[in-house]
Structures are given as structure tokens and as C-alpha cells.
Swiss-Prot record:
Keywords: Cell inner membrane, Cell membrane, Membrane, NAD, Quinone, Translocase, Transport, Ubiquinone. Its main location: membrane. One of its GO terms (cellular component) is plasma membrane. SUPFAM superfamilies: HydB/Nqo4-like (SSF56762). One of its GO terms (molecular function) is NAD binding. This is NADH-quinone oxidoreductase subunit D. NDH-1 shuttles electrons from NADH, via FMN and iron-sulfur (Fe-S) centers, to quinones in the respiratory chain. The immediate electron acceptor for the enzyme in this species is believed to be ubiquinone. Couples the redox reaction to proton translocation (for every two electrons transferred, four hydrogen ions are translocated across the cytoplasmic membrane), and thus conserves the redox energy in a proton gradient. It comes from the Bacteria. Pfam families: Complex1_49kDa.
């Protein structure tokens, strides 16, 4: 009988694929149903953000950051604002810090709700996304009531936040927390001990801690492998040192552990939010929400009607913008997906000389080949879901 040579089978996964989370194209080399090679093709959502930022003043560059990881927009603005504040040497008043932390944690919950529920949908559970989007809708309303926009808020400004929160809004956020924890428990009940969900995620995409560091992982990907590394604790910024919360850590480094960590992180975020709400309604009830330096933060409308200097400041800030002293700085925040960093080079003008964005998803996506090799085709979606990739920040 004549020998037939068996060759591997190449297929495209995406860019139009429901589990590809946007515009991912993976070229998979399959031996039967076993994945031999994964080749991610990125750049389909490249918009030249880093170059565009160089042609905008520091204030005008802020909206670009919302459009990177558009699932949790305010966390990126936060990193950019911190970078500028370090170069300018200004600090944020405590009420402004509390509002920032409150909204950073809202963003984290927005992100984890989407990720957990769509990961469940990728492996076949159809109920969680409906619950997740219901809660996300309420959070988007909180975004809208603070900044006027549901997603691209441009709310964090260098020096603080754009506007103060109405008391009613802070109270409503406080009232939202307990029903939300009930929803998390319902999700927990539906997925955590679910036999099918466990079979699809446990022991899939295992990453040892050494490999996690070597691939440049951060965030949930590192904590899933057993390191308690969270920038909110290890390199604290804003008023996180004053907050009481725990860092969930996995021990197997598989998709299931990463799912469990995200579930617990939502509870911890709610805990941080509760502390912020208590302080915003308690001893930090009144106070400035942004730095009072008129050379950086625009004056209030009321002041502009009375004072010529305020009017001049306002005009200069919105036409020319403030000049940032020459220097370079790296500021990183613990975004929901990992360490989101901004490396900013200032040359003393009103525009950044260079702004490099360190997107956590980029490092995670490049390990796709390493994580999927030897797994089955059906496991690719499970691994991809647990990486938590959004293409706005990967392609920039």
C-alpha cells in the first residue's frame, strides 16, 4: 500500500470570529485537532495613537487614552495624568484622589464583568453576559453622571479630576455596591462549580511563575501563577496605601485560576469603592478636587466672570496649553488587564516629545503560541478569553 504523507493543516482564526474579541487574526497550524503553532497577526486596529499624541497639547492628548482599552477607559487616563503630574511636580488634593480611586475601581469592575461573562460565553454559557451587561449599564450611567460621557470620559485631568461629584451620585454609587455583590454571588454560583466550565478551563493554558516573568506578564496573569504582585500595593500611587483590600493569588496558573482571581478582584474593588464612598460622604465631603495651580488647572467659570487674570489663564490653557519642564518619566497603574505604563518624554514645550504606551495585553498576546501549543483547537478560545485582550491597546 502506498504511503501518504500527512501534512499539517493551517487555518485562520478571525478576524471575523465571535471569540476573537475584536480584530484578532490567529494563523493556527493544526495536526488533527492539536495546535502546533499559533501566529497572532496584529495591527488591524492600529491608529497611530503614539504619533498623534505628539501633535497635541498635554490636555488634548487625554481623550486618546480612553480609546486604548475602551472597556475600562479611565485607568489609562490615570497613568497619563500621573506621568504629567510627576514632571510638573504637582500633587492632587485628597478628595480628587478618592474620586480617582473610586472611578478606577469602577473601571476594573467594568472590565472584569465583561471578561468573565464573555469568557463564559466563549465556552458555551449564554446567561452570564446578559447579567454582566446589566451591571455594566449601571456603571456606565455613573460614568455619564460624572463626566457626561458613557465611555470616553476624559475625566481625569493632570492635577485632579475635571469636576466634583454631586453628593447624590456618591450616595447612589454606595447604594449600588450591595446588590452588585449579590450579582457576583449569582455569577459565582452559575460558573465556579459548573462542571462544563471547570472542564473547559482547569489545567488549560498553564503558565509557571518563571515563564510569567520571562514573558513580561503583569496583572492577573502574574497573580494567577502565584505572585502577589499588584502595583496598588507594591508601587502604591494616589491614596491606595490608605485603603484596606486584599490581593487574590492563584496557585496553578491556569485559565480557571485567572477566572477565580477576577471574581475575587471584583469583590475587593467593591470593598475599595465602599471605603471611598464613606470618606467622600464623611470627612472629605468638601474640598478641592484638583490642584489649585492656575498655571495648570483651568480656573472656575465663576472666577472668570470676576477676574481678568483668570480669563487670561483660561484662554492660554485652552489655546496654547501649559509647558511641561523637560525630562522623562515612567508612570504605571494597575489597570484591570495588568501594568499599563506611560513613558513620557517632555522637551519643555506644550506638547509631548514622545509618549510610549506599555499595553499589558501586548505582552500577553505574544505568549499565545507558548500557551496554546499542544492544546486542542477548542482550548484556544479558553486561553484567549483568560488573557483578557482588547485590541485598542494592543494595536494602539
Amino acid at each position: 500500500m502506498a504511503e501518504t504523507s500527512i501534512r499539517n493543516f493551517n487555518i485562520n482564526f478571525g478576524p471575523q470570529h465571535p471569540a476573537a474579541h475584536g480584530v484578532l487574526r490567529l494563523v493556527l497550524e493544526l495536526d488533527g485537532e492539536v495546535v502546533e503553532r499559533v501566529d497572532p497577526h496584529i495591527g488591524l486596529l492600529h491608529r497611530g495613537t503614539e504619533k498623534l499624541i505628539e501633535y497635541k497639547t498635554y490636555l488634548q492628548a487625554i481623550p486618546y487614552f480612553d480609546r486604548l482599552d475602551y472597556v475600562a477607559p479611565m485607568n489609562q487616563e490615570h497613568a497619563f495624568a500621573l506621568a504629567i503630574e510627576r514632571l510638573l511636580g504637582i500633587d492632587v488634593p485628597i478628595r480628587g484622589q478618592l474620586i480617582r480611586v473610586l472611578y478606577s475601581e469602577i473601571s476594573r469592575i467594568l472590565n472584569h464583568l465583561l471578561n468573565i461573562t464573555t469568557q463564559a460565553m466563549d465556552v458555551g454559557a449564554l446567561t452570564p453576559p446578559l447579567w454582566g451587561f446589566e451591571e455594566r449599564e449601571k456603571l456606565m450611567v455613573f460614568y455619564e453622571r460624572a463626566s457626561g460621557a458613557r465611555m470616553h470620559a476624559a475625566y481625569f485631568r493632570p492635577g485632579g479630576v475635571h469636576q466634583d461629584l454631586p453628593e447624590k451620585l456618591v450616595e447612589d454609587i454606595g447604594k449600588w455596591i450591595d446588590p452588585f455583590l449579590k450579582t457576583v454571588d449569582d455569577l459565582d454560583e452559575l460558573l465556579t462549580e459548573n462542571r462544563i466550565f471547570k472542564q473547559r478551563n482547569a489545567d488549560i493554558g498553564i503558565v509557571s511563575l518563571e515563564d510569567a516573568w520571562a514573558w513580561g506578564f503583569s496583572g492577573v496573569m502574574v497573580r494567577g501563577s502565584g505572585a502577589a504582585w499588584d502595583l496598588r500595593k507594591s508601587q502604591p500611587y494616589e491614596c491606595y496605601p490608605e485603603m484596606d483590600f486584599d490581593i487574590p493569588v492563584g496557585k496553578n496558573g491556569d485559565c480557571y485560576d485567572r477566572y477565580l482571581i477576577r471574581m475575587e478582584e471584583m469583590r475587593q474593588s467593591a470593598k475599595i469603592m465602599r471605603q471611598c464612598v464613606e470618606r467622600l460622604l464623611g470627612k472629605e465631603r468638601v474640598g478641592p478636587v484638583s490642584n489649585m495651580d492656575g498655571k495648570v488647572v483651568p480656573p472656575k467659570r465663576a472666577a472668570m466672570k470676576r477676574s481678568m487674570e483668570s480669563l487670561i489663564h483660561h484662554f492660554k490653557l485652552y489655546t496654547e496649553g501649559y509647558h511641561v519642564p523637560a525630562g522623562e518619566v515612567y508612570a504605571a497603574v494597575e489597570a484591570p488587564k495588568g501594568e499599563f505604563g506611560v513613558y513620557l518624554v517632555a522637551d519643555g514645550t506644550n506638547k509631548p516629545y514622545r509618549c510610549k504606551l506599555r499595553a499589558p495585553g501586548f505582552a500577553h498576546l505574544q505568549a499565545m503560541d507558548f500557551m496554546c501549543r499542544g492544546h486542542l483547537l477548542a482550548d484556544v478560545t479558553a486561553v484567549l478569553g483568560s488573557l483578557d485582550i482588547v485590541f485598542g491597546e494592543v494595536d494602539r
